[in-house]
């Protein structure tokens, strides 16, 4: 079976994708520097799958260490998750984000090219659709960004497109995903960010386990069914399967394709909160706060291309996502 290098493989989406790859019979190599993940995730991946893999603790900015991976292993394709991902922090520390995300990716591309590995699945984001496109978002819409994090995703997409133009032997999949939540049904891995969470679900989880007094709901006066922001939430296991399909695709096709991974349906903050209340069996206090600048009222994906190209579509509904999130957090109240 092909050998897949997964950068950021100990992180939330990375760890679930590693489980999917191992269960599908792939050999994997994980590279991570634990900047936003924990070593325990690697043990949990082994426990879930009963399989072993090679691991390198490496920062992508360290070209020498990075090249060592390619020197010591025959790598057939790369799934590139590694990167900083907090929107607010990117606004406060843009240079840190541009340096880490873009330079790290350039180093990776350099190493790949040097060792003749020209197949990559890149972890992009729905943020590249910017603030003005109508919904649902379709892959051929114009792209833009509103913060440094979004710009790093957009720039990396452009870099990879340019790499393909310069060398048509490359196979590149740009996966634009929406709002991943949920956790592996075993409850062994899930979202466990280092530091302040960036997403809605970890905050709801913290309220549910008593670490946070109440949930802050940013704005209830949007033009949406219940006034709160609407997003396309996708189960992380569906997302992991999407990466599996993308890897199969790049192993067999040359070219560059941007593909949405979402459910194609929007859920509001209150939808998610009430679904989670069902899962944990209690009411969770919340407080409506002013809107956050830059937040969009609603967005969700058009997912036809993923079905067409990969034969992939999301399977899990919101109640399953929140049930699996609760299962993970109740088994791991203090994280991994």
Regions found by a protein language model. Give the residues of each.
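Short-chain dehydrogenase/reductase
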Residues: 98, 146-154, 190, 194-198, ...
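Short, basic/glycine-rich phosphate-binding loops at helix/coil junctions
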Residues: 182-184, 221-222
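N-terminal Rossmann-like NAD(P)+-binding domain of SDR-like oxidoreductases, especially those catalyzing
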Residues: 1-183
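C-terminal substrate-binding subdomain of Rossmann-fold SDR/epimerase-dehydratase oxidoreductases
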Residues: 201-336
């Amino acid at each position: 079976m092909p050998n897949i290098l997964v950068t950021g493989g100990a992180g939330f989406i990375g760890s679930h994708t590693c489980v999917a790859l191992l269960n599908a019979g792939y050999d994997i190599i994980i590279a991570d520097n634990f900047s936003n993940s924990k070593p325990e995730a690697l043990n949990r991946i082994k426990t879930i799958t009963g399989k072993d893999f090679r691991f390198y603790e490496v920062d992508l900015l360290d070209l020498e260490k990075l090249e060592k991976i390619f020197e010591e292993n025959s790598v057939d394709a790369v799934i590139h998750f590694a990167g900083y991902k907090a929107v607010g922090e990117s606004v406060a520390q843009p240079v840190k984000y541009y340096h880490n995300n873009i330079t790290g990716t350039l180093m990776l591309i350099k190493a790949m090219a040097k060792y003749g590995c020209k197949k990559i699945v890149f972890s992009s984001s729905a943020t590249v659709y910017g603030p003005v496109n109508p919904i649902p978002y379709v892959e051929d819409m114009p792209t833009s960004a509103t913060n440094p994090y979004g710009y790093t995703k957009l720039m990396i997409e452009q870099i990879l497109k340019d790499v393909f133009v310069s060398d048509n032997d490359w196979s590149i999949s740009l996966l634009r995903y929406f709002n991943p939540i949920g956790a592996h049904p075993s409850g062994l891995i899930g979202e466990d960010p280092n530091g302040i969470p960036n997403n809605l679900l970890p905050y709801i989880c913290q309220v549910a386990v008593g670490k946070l007094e109440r949930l802050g709901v940013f704005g209830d006066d949007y033009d949406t069914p219940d006034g709160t922001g609407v997003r396309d939430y996708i189960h992380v296991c569906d997302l992991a399967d999407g990466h599996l399909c993308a890897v199969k695709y790049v192993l067999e096709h040359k070219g560059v394709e941007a593909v949405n991974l979402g459910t194609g349906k929007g859920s509001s903050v209150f939808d998610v909160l009430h679904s989670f209340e069902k899962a944990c069996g209690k009411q969770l206090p919340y407080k409506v706060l002013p809107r956050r600048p830059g937040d969009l009222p609603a967005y969700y994906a058009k997912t036809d291309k993923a079905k067409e190209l990969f034969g992939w579509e999301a399977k899990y509904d919101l109640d399953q996502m929140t049930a699996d999130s609760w299962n993970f957090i109740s088994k791991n109240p203090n994280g991994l």
